[in-house]
């Protein structure tokens, strides 16, 4: 912002008129891009219900704070051309910078703590910390702003009003000191989280290491953005304290610090496939009116509620998973039909959905459901279902009812498989949606899906599944033959 006049501003900053004009233009560009980025994130969170969870609440508060700060700053930059030290506009500008920046930093720290709490500590109720977050993120900046206003240290400092160049102690005590402390704590929390997930990755037998490295990057990219956007601000203030005012450092300070909201928004969008598919499908709509990107827009539109990674077309992994899933369903149906022919003679058989067991036991999501205290993996469900059915095996009436239900379920499974095959044929561009509760945190918000090794260490997942089904067949046949022998002896 141009304050007082060009000559006095240049004298205060040590920059020429051309350098000061360039800094002013950079400031406006940074303000507008930050406003656009935060608005897009808030729009996406408002429109996409799958993104409404504890983590995205924190991101929403960060973007809301940054948006309010940038809006007020932009208005003051555009309308207040001639300010003087001690004016209301000058004090307002300084307060907006101090309060808004500190609040954004603290929300970033809360985001780091929440991710650590969810992944490492497996906190079942992360929402209980939100009230403390609000007190922490709103009260601390307020205290710092009140101290700044009460000390009379606000002056015109170039493109904005803030703590004067001669008050280096107040600058670092009220602003850059807390910044360094917040960044250090956030980096420690992210480091502990990354170390934990890295150990899980190393202990797995998954070959998909590249994808896991992508998840690792998503855990730390927002803290990298946090550092890069403010590192030149720290450098510039240290240099200013030495009575030096290099123009290029000041311009980088202006652009990056004001653009923190924009780059943080880009990071949040990148970490959420749901978000960028939704936004990309909207952005491409005008181009489709002229015949451009029609197929791409249609694919993004179909997959905008899909939390998988590849937005355009069906990836090879997705195709293999679809083929494997359909093969398992067909195998299970044949297996269930064979079981139903012997249910009257064999009451000890337990009907299980092997494909669900395989899917749930091989993939674990580090997500905490809103209504459940702990996430239960597929293997636990498998055991619980088996135990509950074993408890009912001694009742003849329940056996007859179970046989009828099994027959109906098999018919439904056959119909569902036919429908699935038709859907896969007709919707080749739609990727399979992850098998997760919609109330749980989307995996790509915090990038923490870790594959669990197969139950048998020497078999592939496909062989493990076949072994499960073959063992069930053998157990059923052996039991059936033993029952026949008992009947013949009688």
Swiss-Prot record:
The chain crosses the membrane at residues 24-43, 58-78, 95-120, 132-150, 174-192, 217-235, 247-271. Residues 303-353, 373-437 are annotated as: Disordered. Pfam families: Dicty_CAR. Residues 44-57, 121-131, 193-216, 272-490 are cytoplasmic. Residues 305-319, 373-389 have a biased composition (Polar residues). Signal peptide: none annotated. The keyword Electron transport does not apply. Its main location: membrane. It is found in: Membrane. Keywords: G-protein coupled receptor, Glycoprotein, Membrane, Phosphoprotein, Receptor, Transducer, Transmembrane, Transmembrane helix. Glycans are attached at residues 5, 85. InterPro entries: GCR1-cAMP_receptor, GPCR_2-like_7TM, GPCR_cAMP. Residues 329-346, 397-427 have a biased composition (Low complexity). GO terms for molecular function: adenylate cyclase activator activity; cAMP binding; cAMP receptor activity; G protein-coupled receptor activity; GTPase activator activity. Residues 1-23, 79-94, 151-173, 236-246 are extracellular. C-terminal Ser or Thr residues may be phosphorylated. One of its GO terms (cellular component) is plasma membrane. Belongs to the G-protein coupled receptor 5 family. PANTHER family: CYCLIC AMP RECEPTOR 1-RELATED, G PROTEIN-COUPLED RECEPTOR 157-RELATED. Receptor for cAMP. Coordinates the aggregation of individual cells into a multicellular organism and regulates the expression of a large number of developmentally regulated genes. The activity of this receptor is mediated by G proteins. This is Cyclic AMP receptor 3. The gene is carC.
């Amino acid at each position: 912002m141009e304050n007082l006049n060009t000559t006095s501003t240049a004298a205060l900053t040590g920059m020429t008129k051309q350098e000061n004009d360039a800094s002013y233009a950079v400031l406006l560009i940074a303000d507008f891009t930050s406003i656009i980025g935060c608005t897009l994130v808030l729009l996406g969170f408002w429109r996409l219900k799958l993104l409404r969870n504890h983590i995205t609440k924190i991101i929403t508060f960060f973007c809301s704070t940054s948006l309010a700060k940038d809006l007020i700053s932009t208005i003051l930059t555009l309308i207040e051309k001639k300010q003087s030290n001690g004016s209301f506009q000058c004090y307002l500008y300084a307060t907006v910078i101090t309060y808004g920046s500190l609040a954004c930093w603290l929300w970033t720290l809360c985001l780091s703590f929440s991710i650590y709490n969810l992944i490492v500590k497996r906190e079942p109720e992360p929402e209980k910390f939100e009230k403390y977050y609000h007190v922490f993120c709103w009260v601390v900046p307020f205290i710092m702003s009140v101290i700044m206003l009460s000390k009379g240290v606000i002056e015109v400092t170039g493109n904005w009003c803030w703590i004067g160049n001669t008050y280096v102690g107040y600058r670092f005590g009220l602003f850059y000191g807390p910044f360094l402390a917040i960044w250090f704590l956030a980096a420690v929390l992210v480091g502990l989280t990354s170390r934990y997930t890295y150990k899980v990755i190393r202990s797995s037998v998954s070959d998909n290491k590249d994808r896991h490295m992508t998840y690792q990057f998503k855990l730390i990219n927002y803290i990298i953005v946090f550092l890069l956007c403010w590192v030149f601000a720290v450098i510039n203030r240290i240099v200013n304290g030495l009575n030096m005012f290099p123009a290029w450092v000041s311009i980088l300070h202006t652009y990056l610090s004001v653009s923190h909201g924009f780059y943080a928004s880009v990071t949040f969008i990148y970490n959420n496939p749901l978000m960028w598919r939704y936004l990309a499908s909207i952005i491409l709509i005008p181009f489709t009116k002229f015949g451009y990107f029609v197929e791409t827009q249609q694919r993004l539109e179909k997959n905008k509620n899909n939390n998988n990674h590849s937005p355009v077309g069906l990836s090879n992994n997705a195709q293999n998973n679809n083929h494997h899933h359909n093969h398992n369903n067909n195998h299970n149906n044949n297996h269930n039909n064979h079981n139903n022919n012997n249910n009257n003679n064999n009451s000890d058989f337990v009907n299980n959905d092997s494909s669900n067991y395989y899917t749930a036991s091989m993939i674990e999501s580090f997500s905490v459901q809103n209504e459940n205290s702990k996430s239960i993996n597929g293997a636990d469900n498998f055991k619980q279902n088996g135990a509950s059915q074993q408890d009912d095996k001694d009742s003849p009436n329940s056996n007859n009812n179970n046989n009828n239900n099994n027959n109906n379920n098999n018919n439904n499974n056959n119909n569902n498989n036919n429908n699935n095959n038709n859907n896969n044929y007709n919707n080749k561009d739609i990727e399979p949606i992850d098998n997760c509760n919609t109330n749980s945190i989307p995996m790509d918000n915090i990038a923490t899906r870790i594959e669990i090794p197969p139950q048998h260490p020497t078999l592939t997942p496909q062989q493990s599944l076949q072994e499960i089904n073959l063992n069930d067949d053998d157990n059923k046949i052996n039991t059936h033959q033993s029952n026949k022998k008992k009947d013949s002896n009688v």
